[in-house]
Amino acid sequence: MATPTGETQPAKHQEVGHKSLLQSDALYQYILETSVYPREPQPMKELRRITAKHPWNLMTTSADEGQFLNLLLKLINAKNTMEIGVYTGYSLLSTALALPEDGKILALDINRENYEIGLPIIQKAGVAHKIDFREGPALPLLDQMLQDEKCHGSFDFIFVDADKDNYLNYHKRLIDLVKFGGVIGYDNTLWNGSLVAPADAPLRKYVRYYRDFVLELNKALAVDPRVEICQLPVGDGITLCRRIS
């Protein structure tokens, strides 16, 4: 979807909403044009435009959320990070640009082909050396890492934007891998507004299927004494969990 300024937006999930949960499209466009696009690094702008042409572009991180993650990582002085769910690498590039020169990202995804769409831009941006990309399911690798005491509490920040039906399985493992005071960010925790949609809302099949898993995650995080949480209506909803015990 092209905007009045010529920018291409990702496709909508379904009729209930889109990548912004704001009720006003005009207000969301104002945020993008005033605060996001003018500050968006050129490599991220280039990758966003390329990704917008991909048939699965609704999987990408929104531009305002990419900006949010970039600033958050700088605020917490993150150095060692993990990302589960990479797609073409927009949020990955946002992270890589925020980290110091010796920062590291363990990037996990089941599809290398999608990652390679953004890889030339990541390389051109001079941050590819920060990324350790692993293709395959994340859970077996997380279980392997948990067997190594050196991995416990070793990550400053972990971002999860992958299979929603495994979010709780990820959380059970990631809580031991993130350091005390470190942050885990779960994406899509408002799931396009479908969490409060009427029973007869025109939800796509996959949205309706994953809805219950997102609801289950939100309920679990709300009562988890090991973390402080903050759920924000940025992008499709992101919940930040700061480990405290």
Swiss-Prot record:
S-adenosyl-L-methionine binds at residues 61, 83, 85-86, 91, 109, 138, 163. GO terms for biological process: lignin biosynthetic process; methylation. InterPro entries: Cation-dep_OMT (IPR050362), SAM-dependent_MTases_sf (IPR029063), SAM_O-MeTrfase (IPR002935). Its cofactor is a divalent metal cation. The keyword Zinc does not apply. Pathway: Aromatic compound metabolism; phenylpropanoid biosynthesis. The keyword Transferase applies. GO terms for molecular function: caffeoyl-CoA O-methyltransferase activity; metal ion binding. It comes from the Eukaryota. Gene3D superfamilies: Vaccinia Virus protein VP39. A divalent metal cation binds at residues 161, 187-188. Methylates caffeoyl-CoA to feruloyl-CoA and 5-hydroxyferuloyl-CoA to sinapoyl-CoA. Plays a role in the synthesis of feruloylated polysaccharides. Involved in the reinforcement of the plant cell wall. Also involved in the responding to wounding or pathogen challenge by the increased formation of cell wall-bound ferulic acid polymers. Belongs to the class I-like SAM-binding methyltransferase superfamily. Cation-dependent O-methyltransferase family. CCoAMT subfamily. This is Caffeoyl-CoA O-methyltransferase. It comes from Zinnia elegans (Garden zinnia).
